[in-house]
Amino acid sequence: MTVTAALLLVALIAPLAAALATLGWPEPAAPGHPARTGARWRRALVLAASAATAACTLALAALVQRGDTTTLSLLQLTPHTWLTLRVDAVGALYAATAAVLWLLALVYAVGYLRGPRLGRVHAALMVCLAAAIGVAYAGNLLTFFVFYELLSVLTYVLVVHDETPAALAAGLKYIVYVLFGGSLVLAGVLLTFALAGDLSFTVDGVFAAGAPANALRVAFACFALGFGVKAALMPLHGWVADAHPAAPAPCSALLSGVLVAAGGFGLVRVCFEVFGVDTLRSLGVMPWLGAAAAVTIVVAALLALQQDDLKRRLAYSTVSQMGYVTLALALLGPVATAGALVHLVHHAFLKGTLFFCAGSFAHATGRRGMASLAGLAARTPVTAAAFTLATLGMIGVPPLSGFVSKWWLGVGMLESSAPATLVLLLLGALLAAGYLLPVVFALYFAKVVTRPLEVAPKPGVAARSFEVEHRASLLAAISVAAALTLVLGVAASAAGFPLALARQAAATFFGGG
């Protein structure tokens, strides 16, 4: 077995093994109870498994840049169909992003998650991490669908973790949406097999030159709508604004940075490795996808402006930002595609930082409304500074990571002879400033209002009063995530960084690598 194959297996198996092990530990009990010790070991185990997966994915990303790739067959389903894993540039990019953000979310969860059901959520987090790795390294369309659906369905556990009426309602809406989207993706898979007899990922696409155009358009529509549900493409975004506030803050960060991004990643795989650039151009379907993306960018940002709940505001921001990714893919240009891929990565860490901070603000005040943020920077200076840094990154201020991805998006728009789309890029940045800068202003300059120091209790959890910046795990996750928004911008062109992998993947899709 090669080193690449071994790293691939460890990245997938480590979180699955941790999930099985965590289910055997009892739930936390009163201080001094043996279950308390078990809970600590469980947290240590999931952190170790997540760290191992992150290390493996980063090593695989480095190997891919050197030209090392591998294909690993896991299970034969039919004489011609295997569950297969494959390491390539675009998969390595998504896998490393998911694994690193997952590790940060688990570190944050150490200081954030309390109460019952921790074993359940830890197990779900580990299986979801393994599913995300499977999505990233899927070697064919069937393997992708299996892991994609596993990730979609098990995320329900994260959404309903608190088991409040709002969380259960959000979970129901979420599962209805993703099952609908998954059924459309399955229809696309079946149509692809019927038309091509092949579910491989191939740069030139799997369809023969004489394939019926209208049937191909139907297949593409199934994929676009199915993945559009996960990618929050309007009007398929309805689950996002309820699921993000309902989920605990570390899970909200993963919803935004990994789960929603999985929809965008699915579009990348289907566009460039199922249909291929030439087929998509001949079908004439991409302008329709671009139009939906344009509406998503603007309307979601306008909806974000209207939200008083900070997590809902951030959720609509995610919808708007994913519109950039879809719009860039619709342009079918190498630079625009590289910009879309790097924006998937940079947005994940920017939005992860913002959701971590939002969770800490809510813990410090017991509320999520804008009024509760007034003057909070005095009590949470590090968290407020991290939120400010990520806000500037989301707007696209240099030299932060958001500027780098939006620069490449802009250059790609010009290269693709679509300068009008630059208006959307600039308008989106202005609207992002409109819905995020007021939060920063409130943190530093708004008049302090009466604010409870005790967190509003959740069912089954005793109310706690604490200063969030006294919890090292919260500060560590927030600080590292915020630092990444700076490092990924300042050192964007360095070897091994996301931009290099994004350009490598785009060059492969368009025949330059």
Describe the residue ranges of each PLM region.
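Transmembrane helix-loop-helix hairpins at membrane boundaries of multipass inner-membrane proteins
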Residues: T2-L9, A17-A123, D198-G205, P498-G511
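Hydrophobic alpha-helical transmembrane segments of integral membrane proteins
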Residues: A11-L12, T22, A231, I395, ...
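Short helix-coil transition/hinge motifs at the ends and kinks of transmembrane helices
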Residues: A29-R36, F275-G284, P452-V455, A462-A463
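Alpha-helical transmembrane segments and their helix-start/interface "positive-inside/aromatic belt" motifs
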Residues: A39-S50, A169-L179, A253, T380-A384, ...
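Hydrophobic alpha-helical membrane-insertion segments
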Residues: A48-A62, L179-A187, S256, A390, ...
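Hydrophobic transmembrane alpha-helices and their helix-loop junctions in integral membrane proteins
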Residues: L104-R114, L118-G119, V127-L142, L154-L443
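Short phosphate-coordinating micro-motif centered on Lys-Gly-acidic
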Residues: E149
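Cytoplasmic/organellar membrane-interface segments at the starts of transmembrane helices
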Residues: A247-P248, T380-V382, L436-G513
